A protein has these predicted regions:
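Intrinsically disordered, low-complexity segments enriched in small/polar residues
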Residues: 69, 134, 149-150
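Ser/Thr-centric signal marking residues that sit
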Residues: 53, 100, 143
C-alpha cells in the first residue's frame, strides 16, 4: 500500500480498506504475545515505575515494521522504542501490551492498542484482545463489527 493507494486508504472514502488492514495486524502481534504469555520472563522497570517485558518490545517492533511497510511516510510513536517521524501528516500510536501487569501475572485481560491520528485528530482505533480472540476497529465515522462474533463496536 504505497503511493496512491496509501493516500486512498487514509481518506474518508476508504474506511473499509483501512479497517481490513487493521484487522490483519493480529496476525503480526498475536503469535509473539502468545509465545511469551505465561512463559516466565524478565521484567524491566521504566522511569515512571511501569513494567516492560521483552514481549512489549517485540510486539511493538513487529507492529512498527508492519505499519512502516504499508505507510512509510507516517509517524510511528510507541511506548518502548524511539519515535519515527514521517512527512505525511499522519501518525500511528502504539501501545503493544496495554495491561502489562496483567500480562506478567498471567491474566488474559490485556490488549494491543493502535490509533491513527492526523494533526492531533483521531481517525482510527484498534483494540486487540489476543487471549480471548476479540479485535475491534473503528475508522472515522465508520464502525465495524468485532471480528469474533459480530458484536458491534
Amino acid at each position: 500500500m504505497t503511493g496512491q493507494h496509501q493516500n486512498r486508504v487514509h481518506s474518508q472514502l476508504d474506511n473499509v480498506a483501512l479497517a481490513d488492514f487493521l484487522y490483519g495486524l493480529p496476525a503480526v502481534s498475536r503469535p509473539i504475545i502468545r509465545e511469551w504469555f505465561r512463559s516466565g520472563h524478565d521484567v524491566e522497570w521504566k522511569a515512571d515505575d511501569s513494567p516492560v517485558t521483552m514481549a512489549d518490545k517485540s510486539v511493538e517492533l513487529a507492529l512498527r515494521e508492519a505499519l512502516a511497510a504499508q505507510f512509510p511516510d507516517d509517524d510511528i510513536l510507541g511506548e518502548e522504542h524511539a519515535d519515527q517521524r514521517g512527512t505525511s501528516g499522519y501518525g500511528w500510536v502504539i501501545d503493544p501490551i496495554d495491561g502489562t501487569r496483567a500480562f506478567i501475572c498471567g491474566r488474559p485481560v490485556f490488549g494491543t492498542l493502535i490509533g491513527l491520528v492526523r494533526d492531533g485528530v483521531p481517525l482510527a482505533g484498534f483494540i486487540d484482545m489476543p487471549m480471548v480472540d476479540e479485535c475491534y476497529v473503528a475508522c472515522l465515522l465508520y464502525t465495524s463489527d468485532a471480528a469474533d462474533e459480530g458484536h458491534c463496536v
